[in-house]
Amino acid sequence: VEEFKDREFIQIDTPWGKPSDNILKTKYNNKEIYFLPRHGRGHLISPSKINFRANIDALKQLGVTDIVSVSAVGSLKEDLPPGKFVIVDQFIDRTFARSKTFFDDEIVAHVSMAHPTSSGLMNSCEQAIKKENIEYQRGGTYIVMEGPQFSTLAESNLYRSWNADVIGMTNMPEAKLAREAEIRYASVSMITDFDCWHPDHENVDVQQVIKVLLDNAKKA
């Protein structure tokens, strides 16, 4: 985001509290865009402590109609090595300590999550990734774990048996809340490691994850 010269930081309050950080307002290709770091600047907020409802509500207040989520993930498949991107189209929600709906107090609402991402936004993400010559896969299932700990070997092998593609900690309930708020959503997952299942690679190492994450950030 440092490359954007015309920058304004906006502070927003919501009925759900404050979002993770002030929201950056800028322009790209003459279009107004917003950026919100879900972990806060400096990466200070644990996945379980992210105020997802405030984040989505703040973006809704700003008139945001489309969200492109970018996140670091572990790979659950041999053909998805570190450095590759996955344009996710499905999720399996394994979180348990997060507020997951706007409709939990004196009102009930149901929304379909059969197809949680926007195909149109996925097309836009794919075009941008192709333009940068980044290796990627279109489509894939993202296991969302609670964290902040990484998987046990048994958990990693279980998720592989489910034919999931990647594992991370942040896209739920984000995608569910975006759907409730009627905001189109797409997810680009940047692979940093092989989780802990791969016999020829070491278990998840924070320093190695950070190294690949920084490389992926340059691509993004």
Model-derived features: positions:
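Generic non-transmembrane alpha-helical segments
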Residues: 120, 124-135, 219
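A C-terminal functional module that forms or caps the active site or interfaces directly
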Residues: 153-194
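General beta-strand structural signal in soluble alpha/beta enzymes
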Residues: 35-37, 67-71, 87, 136-139, ...
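His/Asp/Glu-rich mid-to-C-terminal helical/loop segments that flank catalytic regions of hydrolases
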Residues: 196-220
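Short, hinge-like loop/turn segments at secondary-structure boundaries
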Residues: 84-89, 184-187, 203-206
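Active-site/ligand-binding-proximal alpha/beta "capping" segment
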Residues: 128-165
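Glycine-rich beta-alpha junction loops
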Residues: 74, 91-92, 141-146, 173, ...
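Metabolite-binding pocket within alpha/beta catalytic cores that recognizes anionic/polar moieties
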Residues: 1-113
